[in-house]
């Protein structure tokens, strides 16, 4: 039986990404696949779902990630232990396809995850629900009328917007780190 693993910080169907993910899981099941959904347990607890649930992390991990974001503008780069634990679960599941919706949301370390995905050589589908994956900080650059992301982010006009950083602006470094991590998977295995 083929296996699908989807990743998103929220599971609840009151959010667009949670609903989309659950509906894709139901469609996969209806077509004979085994469906798994990985999400931030600390943010959503246990919710009804037809797919097998893979809760990731806990409240302490989310709090540490929140602090790394708010103080150092390093969103997506904390939760190291939770990410390594999740990778062990991915190995156990051994999915045929990994479908990423969002990986921001205080629950995964994208560098660790993408280093693993690049080595696994499995197809990765990434549905782009917002702009965070290709900017140095923000989710929606249009709110600030900013087009720095086209060349290189830095001095982010939305530093204090979600995911807010109150001390540092590391949008230049974040842009570099994301580009390196997100392009580490062979193009033939990455579908965006």
Question: Which residue ranges define each predicted feature?
Answer:
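Catalytic cores of nucleotide-sugar-dependent glycosyltransferases that transfer UDP/GDP/TDP-activated
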Residues: 2-192
């Amino acid at each position: 039986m083929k296996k699908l693993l989807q990743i998103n910080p929220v599971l609840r169907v009151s959010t667009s990404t949670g609903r989309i993910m659950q509906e894709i899981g139901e469609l996969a099941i209806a077509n004979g696949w085994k469906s798994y959904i990985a999400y931030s347990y600390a943010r959503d607890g246990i919710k009804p779902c037809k797919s097998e649930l893979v809760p990731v992390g806990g409240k302490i991990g989310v709090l540490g990630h929140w602090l790394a974001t708010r103080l150092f503008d390093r969103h997506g780069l904390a939760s190291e232990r939770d990410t390594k634990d999740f990778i062990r679960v991915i190995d156990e599941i051994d999915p045929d396809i990994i479908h990423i919706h969002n990986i921001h949301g205080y629950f995964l370390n994208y560098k660790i995850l993408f280093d693993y995905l690049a080595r696994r050589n499995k197809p990765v589908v990434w549905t782009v629900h917002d702009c965070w994956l290709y900017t140095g900080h923000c989710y929606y650059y249009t709110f600030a009328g900013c087009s720095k992301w086209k060349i290189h982010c830095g001095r982010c006009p939305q530093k204090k917007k979600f995911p807010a950083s109150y001390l540092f602006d590391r949008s230049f470094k974040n842009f570099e780190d994301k580009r390196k991590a997100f392009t580490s998977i062979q193009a033939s295995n990455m579908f965006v």
